[in-house]
Each structure stands twice: as C-alpha cells, then as structure tokens.
C-alpha cells in the first residue's frame, strides 16, 4: 500500500485519541481490516488526495474511521459493498479492479469481534468507513 500512496502523492493523516488504550482483539484480523480499508481508500482516491485514519476510545468501544476524498459511492449502491462478490458497477468504478470481497470480509471480521461497520459516502465527495469494536469482548466463533 505504501508504494501506491507514494506514487499517487496521497496525504495520509493518522490520529489516535487517547494514544494509550488497549483493545482485546485478534491483532492479525484487526490489521487485515485496516489494510483492506486503507487499500480501498488508496484505490479510489485520485492523485494528490487525502486519506485520514482515526482511532478513538468511546466508553467501552474503540471507534475506527477511515476517510478519503476519493470518488465516493452513490447512496443506492452503499448496501451492495458489504455483500460478497457485489461491486458497484458505474462509470465511476468500472476502471478499478477487485473481487468484491474486501468490505464483506471487513464486515465479517468486525462482527467476529462483536462490533459493527457502516459507511457514509456521496459520489464525488469520498467515503468514510466507520467500525466499532468492544474494548474487552471475546471474539465470536464462526
């Protein structure tokens, strides 16, 4: 991902607040969730764009936000992106390759941690994916 960020001259902003709290989570799965979301943000953000990653402690949950100022997703297509093998098929996204598994996988891994994921987006205005994971809840077996 780093090479794509560099080649597209993207600005990446990171913020952790506070910067010293712990989350009981599967580290590999949490890393995969963030990798998938960051990869999508990079893929759908144009040269010179911006990506922001925020992590907040909210009472008993950790809130993660991955925001970009890329192409965005039309309202009628937003539910599709969390369904396996579904992809938004429009002139905006046709040039981008993918399997349609990234966000469904994110959803499944977040839910395994007892959390949930949703997004806010509009065409031409970028996308914000938010997921919340309980700070001290065991993973659900699948």
Task: Outline where the language-model segments fall.
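Short helix-loop "hinge" at the ATP-lid/N-box region of the Bergerat-fold HATPase_c
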Residues: 41-42
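Conserved catalytic submotifs in the C-terminal HATPase_c
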Residues: 6, 11-21
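Glycine-rich G1-box
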Residues: 3, 71-72
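Short alpha-helical Gxxx[C/S/T] motif in the catalytic ATP-binding
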Residues: 97, 102, 106
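Short helix N-cap motif at coil->helix boundaries in the Bergerat
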Residues: 72-80
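Short beta-strand/loop element within the Bergerat-fold HATPase_c
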Residues: 48-60
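Conserved glycine-rich
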Residues: 114-115
């Amino acid at each position: 991902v780093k090479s794509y960020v560099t080649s597209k001259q993207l600005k990446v902003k990171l913020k952790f607040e506070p910067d010293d709290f712990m989350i009981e989570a599967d580290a590999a799965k949490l890393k995969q969730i963030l990798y998938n979301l960051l990869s999508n943000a990079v893929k759908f953000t144009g040269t010179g764009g911006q990506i922001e990653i925020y992590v907040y402690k909210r009472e008993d949950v950790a809130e993660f936000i991955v925001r970009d100022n890329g192409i965005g997703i039309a309202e009628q297509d937003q539910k599709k992106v969390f369904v396996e093998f579904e992809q938004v098929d429009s002139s905006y996204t046709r040039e981008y390759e993918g399997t349609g598994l990234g966000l469904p996988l994110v959803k499944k891994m977040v839910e395994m941690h007892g959390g949930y994921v949703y997004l806010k987006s509009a065409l031409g205005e970028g996308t914000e994916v938010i997921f919340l994971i309980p700070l001290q809840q065991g993973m659900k077996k699948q």
